Amino acid sequence: MTKTIFISTKENTGSIEFQIVNFTKKICKLTDHLKLHKKDYLSQRGLRQMLGKRQRLLVYLSKINLPSYNDLILKLKIREAKKDLS
């Protein structure tokens, strides 16, 4: 998975899309680590935190820019974020 697909310029590292791609890359690495080290509970906690952060960013992106959100979840092959009921 490359970040260059989603980044328009190098100064755009704070964009929501870049952050989601970065979290997805970290989540994939940590998932591979946890397949080998099943009892690494601190890493499991870190994974849950990253998943939560990515999920919150996805919800925010879906609220402000729905076409970009749909494009991103298709390219990254991740599930759709749960919508807020409030």
Curated annotation (Swiss-Prot):
Q: What does UniProt give as GO cellular component?
A: plastid; ribonucleoprotein complex; ribosome
- Matches recorded under Pfam families: Ribosomal_S15 (PF00312)
SUPFAM superfamilies according to UniProt: S15/NS1 RNA-binding domain (SSF47060)
What compartments host this protein? Answer: Plastid
Disulfide bond positions: none
Keyword Ribosomal protein present in the record's keywords: the answer is yes
Query: What GO molecular functions are on record for this protein?
Result: structural constituent of ribosome
Q: Look up keyword Ribosomal protein and say if it applies.
A: yes
> How does this chain assemble?
Part of the 30S ribosomal subunit.
HAMAP family given in the database record: Ribosomal_uS15_B
Q: What is this protein called?
A: Small ribosomal subunit protein uS15c
